[in-house]
């Protein structure tokens, strides 16, 4: 086996024990702190208290699922790997498309590189939308909870997952979808013992429940039990998140929304601007496709600065940037973002047109993400790490660097 693997200009040491990197979708640090304080997450509590290393990191912008999962598994920001949303306007096709196809990925992954070098690699994701991106050119086991009953050796590198896990295939809108990921990960570590494993959950619970609530604490208690078991099995464990989560509603419980397409249409007329919401994915029931980040494309370049200035003056808007400035500040691919990039404040979300958002599935006040307010995420490791500069800006895509390069090596 090689001693080092270089991927996207970052070099990683070969693992000396199994490494499990966990992306807990929507995990604002307060969820962990509240569960520890309630006494339901003793393992995480021990890591934070000094049995491991507890850091706070920044996720990439926009603070959505696809850009951050792909940053974690490539070790680089979206400006390099190309995945800048769950959804984008494809200028080559002239249409709005989901960003789930590996053709949109511009670099290889750490997972694929290690598998090509002979490592046993496994990926388990909650939603199937991520599976092909995470498993791009990777040899090994790769499946989703969502479609665990449809796995095959040819497509997924494994079979009979449902029987092995001992759980029925969960609803996409459930805590059980993420629990399936963890239980399956434990089963794989017990039997196949992969060298490298990536587990990615869904944020259904975080969209529904605030930190410290019974529902949230029950969810983190489940995570805690499974992480403790992976530790018992001898794995190095790195836990991070793709983004945080915040309340985005008014005092009356209604979503605090700026319908930006309607607003711009009223200013300059219809069909002169297109608002894209990169939070959009096939699973909108728990967030109504409302997040704190939007892209604006304008038919007339001369309108850009005037429209940007008017957007910046709207109540609830935090940041408005032109394309080049946004690409530089947020490390985004300039050819895949709008003429104008808009970020709303912590308690506000951005919609397109009022009649394009079905909010009937919101049975609790809206919680969502996408802005800089959701950039701070946990970065926990169950080992000591070698000393790092106090000024280092930790990123969630440093997870593999921590687990392979900086964690104290086994004796």
What spans do the regions from the language model cover?
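Active-site neighborhoods of enzymes that stabilize oxyanions during catalysis
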Residues: 277-411
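Short catalytic/ligand-binding loop motif for oxyanion handling, primarily in non-cytosolic enzymes
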Residues: 29-31, 81, 129-135, 205-209, ...
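Short, structured active-site-proximal loop/turn typified by the sulfatase FGly-forming signature C/S-X-P-X-R
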Residues: 32-76, 122
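Acidic/histidine-rich catalytic neighborhood
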Residues: 228, 245-297
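A long, amphipathic alpha-helix that forms part
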Residues: 13-14, 174-239, 243-247
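Active-site metal-binding loops of divalent metal-dependent hydrolases
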Residues: 26, 241-245, 346
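Active-site-proximal N-terminal segment of extracellular/periplasmic enzymes that hydrolyze or transfer
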Residues: 1-52
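His/Asp/Glu-rich, glycine-adjacent segments
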Residues: 71-210, 286, 292, 298, ...
């Amino acid at each position: 086996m090689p001693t080092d693997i270089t991927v996207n200009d970052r070099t990683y040491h070969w693992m000396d024990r199994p490494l499990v990197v966990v992306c807990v979708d929507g995990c604002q640090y307060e969820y962990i702190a509240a569960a520890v304080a309630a006494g339901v997450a003793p393992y995480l509590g021990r890591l934070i208290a000094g049995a491991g290393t507890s850091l706070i990191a920044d996720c990439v912008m926009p603070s959505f699922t696809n850009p951050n999962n792909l940053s974690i598994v490539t070790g680089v920001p979206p400006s390099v790997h190309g995945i800048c949303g769950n959804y984008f306007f494809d200028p080559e096709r002239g249409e709005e498309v989901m960003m789930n196809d590996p053709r949109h990925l511009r670099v290889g992954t750490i997972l694929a590189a290690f598998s090509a070098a002979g490592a046993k690699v496994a990926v388990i994701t909650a939603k199937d939308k991520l599976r092909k991106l995470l498993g791009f050119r990777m040899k090994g086991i790769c499946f989703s909870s969502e479609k665990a009953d449809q796995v095959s050796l040819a497509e997924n590198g494994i079979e009979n997952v449902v029987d092995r896990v001992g759980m029925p295939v969960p609803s996409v809108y459930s805590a059980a979808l993420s629990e399936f990921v963890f239980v399956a990960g434990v089963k794989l570590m017990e039997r196949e013992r992969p060298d490298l494993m990536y587990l990615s959950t869904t944020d259904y619970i975080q969209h529904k429940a605030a930190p410290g609530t019974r529902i949230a604490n029950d969810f983190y208690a489940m995570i805690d039990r499974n992480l403790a078991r992976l530790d018992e099995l001898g794995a190095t464990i790195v836990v991070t998140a793709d983004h945080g989560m915040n309340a985005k509603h008014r005092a009356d419980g209604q979503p605090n929304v700026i319908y930006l397409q309607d607003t711009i249409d009223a200013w300059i007329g219809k069909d002169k601007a297109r608002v894209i919401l990169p939070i959009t994915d096939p699973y909108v029931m728990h967030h109504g496709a409302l997040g704190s980040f939007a892209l604006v494309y304008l038919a007339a370049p001369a309108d850009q600065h005037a429209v940007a200035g008017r957007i910046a003056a709207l109540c609830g808007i935090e940041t408005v940037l032109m394309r080049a400035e946004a690409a530089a500040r947020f490390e985004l691919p300039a050819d895949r973002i709008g003429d104008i990039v808009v970020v709303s404040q912590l308690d506000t979300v951005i919609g397109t047109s009022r009649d394009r958002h079905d909010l009937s599935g919101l049975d609790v006040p809206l919680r969502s993400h996408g802005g800089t307010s959701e950039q701070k995420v946990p970065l926990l490791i169950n080992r000591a790490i070698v000393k790092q500069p106090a000024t280092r800006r930790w990123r969630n895509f440093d997870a593999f660097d921590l687990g392979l390069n900086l964690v104290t090596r086994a004796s």
